[in-house]
């Protein structure tokens, strides 16, 4: 026995005979039932938004304002704080009410989405063509598909511009680089120079270059969102008003499963990029909320021990370590003064607590001897003991302690989860792309289900 994909647009129910898929194939049964598929998607959106709201309120219920967010395992409240809500100088929480509002708004909107999902899954038209030709579609209708793509792009562009509006007109964003240890700041002069914005795309992804992940100021972040927002909206209008060119019609597979594979591929790429951002970037993921990056914790340890030993009388400019290199300070191959020891590998780290101590040629020895501020000392000590490393002993030069088994950095959670999910999405992309291409070539008949245990089981109903 072979499970076939149904080519009929007139499928009227969701059993195996009419759809080609059994109940356990989930939404595959709804490929040609646009109304029911809409219900599944709206309900799914409701679940996502419900999780966001409920989890925000859960984090808030357990939140201790006196402790850093990253010490409490929080991943949602830090995102709200990064947008400038509820926090003040140094990332200190000054008002928890915005966190409550965000959670409740998500809960309420999830109820609306949930109702819409249930309605379209149970009561709404099976196919949207019954309701309106505007909302109806055929997977093979190339013009309709690119029109739908256009609407999606416009919504994405509006989303990007909402961040711009928050940054420029509605209170600003939290800027970890603000003088004195970070503060909420309105972005009045976003970077619009295309050479700067698109220059990030041309950078090497390695070392100190860091591709787009290397962005280290909010002017460039907001300017980039202005560019991408306008490009998405312009692209959306373009796709609504035009029909696909001949080369596009020939190059792409035009089927529901092909669109699924394209979407999974895009999500996979974004997941991998998000992994790099949350692991390495301390501008859009401020360390005050997410904890230090790995290189940051290592550099913070070098700074902490330098401060300690300098107070005890060590000459940090000339002391040698066990290898003959500088124990506290040394020169990089290109001549800059950098921290010595194992943290030399992270010589190109940049952080707001360290940059005031730099001069024209790396770390400034005079500033290190005479101008380290108490807030820099405190922050280095704090970051040293909160490295995003799951280990009980020294890793990469960071001396962790036995209690660190109770600390897992949000950067570790977010980077690992996004990497794993991005990988699964990549596999899904390849799987569905292969099936879509095979179906288009005319030799995809599905998987032989003869020995499938579920086929010998009684019906659920």
Curated annotation (Swiss-Prot):
Cofactor binding notes: Binds multiple chlorophylls and provides some of the ligands for the Ca-4Mn-5O cluster of the oxygen-evolving complex. It may also provide a ligand for a Cl- that is required for oxygen evolution. PSII binds additional chlorophylls, carotenoids and specific lipids.
InterPro entries: PS_antenna-like, PS_II_antenna-like_sf, PSII_PsbC, PSII_PsbC_sf
GO biological process, one term: photosynthetic electron transport in photosystem II
Keywords annotated in UniProt: Chlorophyll, Chromophore, Manganese, Membrane, Metal-binding, Photosynthesis, Photosystem II, Thylakoid, Transmembrane, Transmembrane helix
GO cellular component, one term: plasma membrane-derived thylakoid membrane
Lumenal side: 72-111, 179-232, 290-424
Cytoplasmic side: 1-48, 134-155, 254-268, 450-461
Membrane topology: Multi-pass membrane protein
Superkingdom of origin: Bacteria
Coiled-coil positions: none
Cell compartment(s), UniProt: Cellular thylakoid membrane
Record flagged with keyword Hydrolase: no
Annotated [CaMn4O5] cluster binding sites: 355
Sequence intervals crossing the membrane: 49-71, 112-133, 156-178, 233-253, 269-289, 425-449
GO terms, molecular function: chlorophyll binding; electron transporter, transferring electrons within the cyclic electron transport pathway of photosynthesis activity; metal ion binding
Residues of the signal peptide: none
Similarity field: Belongs to the PsbB/PsbC family. PsbC subfamily.
NCBIfam families: PS_antenn_a_b, psbC
Quaternary organization: PSII is composed of 1 copy each of membrane proteins PsbA, PsbB, PsbC, PsbD, PsbE, PsbF, PsbH, PsbI, PsbJ, PsbK, PsbL, PsbM, PsbT, PsbX, PsbY, PsbZ, Psb30/Ycf12, peripheral proteins PsbO, CyanoQ (PsbQ), PsbU, PsbV and a large number of cofactors. It forms dimeric complexes. Part of a photosystem II (PSII) assembly intermediate complex PSII-I; crystallized from a strain deleted of psbJ, it forms monomeric PSII before addition of the oxygen evolving complex.
Described purpose of this protein according to its UniProt entry: One of the components of the core complex of photosystem II (PSII). It binds chlorophyll and helps catalyze the primary light-induced photochemical processes of PSII. PSII is a light-driven water:plastoquinone oxidoreductase, using light energy to abstract electrons from H(2)O, generating O(2) and a proton gradient subsequently used for ATP formation.
Protein known as: Photosystem II CP43 reaction center protein
Source organism: Thermosynechococcus vestitus (strain NIES-2133 / IAM M-273 / BP-1)
């Amino acid at each position: 026995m072979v499970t076939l994909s149904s080519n009929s647009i007139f499928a009227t129910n969701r059993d195996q005979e009419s759809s080609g898929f059994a109940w356990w194939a989930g939404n595959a049964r709804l490929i040609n039932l646009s109304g029911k598929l809409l219900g599944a998607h709206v309900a799914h959106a409701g679940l996502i938004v419900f999780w966001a709201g409920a989890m925000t309120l859960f984090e808030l219920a357990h939140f201790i304002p006196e402790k850093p967010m990253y010490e409490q395992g929080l991943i949602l409240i830090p995102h709200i704080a990064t947008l400038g809500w509820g926090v003040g100088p140094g990332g200190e929480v000054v008002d928890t009410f915005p966190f409550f509002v965000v959670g409740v708004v998500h809960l309420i909107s999830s109820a609306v989405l949930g109702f819409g999902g249930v309605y379209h899954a149970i009561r709404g038209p099976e196919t949207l063509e019954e309701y309106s030709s505007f909302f109806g579609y055929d997977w093979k209708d190339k013009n309709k598909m690119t029109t739908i793509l256009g609407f999606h792009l416009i919504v994405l562009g509006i989303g990007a511009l909402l961040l711009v509006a928050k940054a420029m007109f509605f209170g600003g964003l939290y800027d970890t680089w603000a003088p004195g240890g970070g503060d909420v700041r309105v972005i009045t002069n976003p970077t619009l120079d295309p050479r700067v914005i698109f220059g990030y795309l041309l950078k090497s992804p390695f070392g100190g270059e860091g591709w787009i992940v290397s962005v280290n100021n909010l002017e460039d972040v907001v300017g980039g969102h202005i560019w991408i927002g306008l490009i998405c909206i312009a692209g959306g209008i373009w796709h609504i008003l035009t029909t696909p060119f001949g080369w596009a019609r020939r190059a792409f597979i035009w089927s529901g499963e092909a669109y699924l594979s394209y979407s999974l591929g895009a999500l996979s790429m974004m997941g991998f990029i998000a992994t790099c951002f949350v692991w390495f970037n301390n501008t859009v993921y401020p360390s005050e909320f997410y904890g230090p990056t790995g290189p940051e914790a290592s550099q913070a340890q070098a700074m902490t021990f330098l401060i300690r030993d300098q107070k005890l009388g060590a000459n940090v400019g000339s002391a040698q370590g066990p290898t003959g290199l500088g124990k506290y300070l040394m020169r990089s191959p290109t001549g800059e003064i950098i921290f010595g020891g194992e943290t030399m590998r992270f010589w190109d780290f940049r952080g707001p607590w360290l940059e005031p101590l730099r001069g024209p040629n790396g770390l400034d020895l005079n500033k290190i001897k005479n101008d380290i501020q108490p807030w820099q000392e405190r922050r280095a000590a704090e970051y040293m003991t909160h490295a995003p490393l799951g280990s009980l002993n020294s890793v990469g030069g960071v001396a962790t302690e036995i209690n660190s088994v109770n600390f897992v950095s949000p950067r570790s959670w977010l980077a690992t989860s996004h990497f794993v999910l991005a990988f699964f999405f990549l596999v899904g992309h390849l799987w569905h792309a292969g099936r879509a291409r095979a179906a288009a070539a005319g030799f995809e008949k599905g998987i032989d289900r003869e020995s499938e245990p579920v086929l010998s089981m009684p019906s659920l109903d």
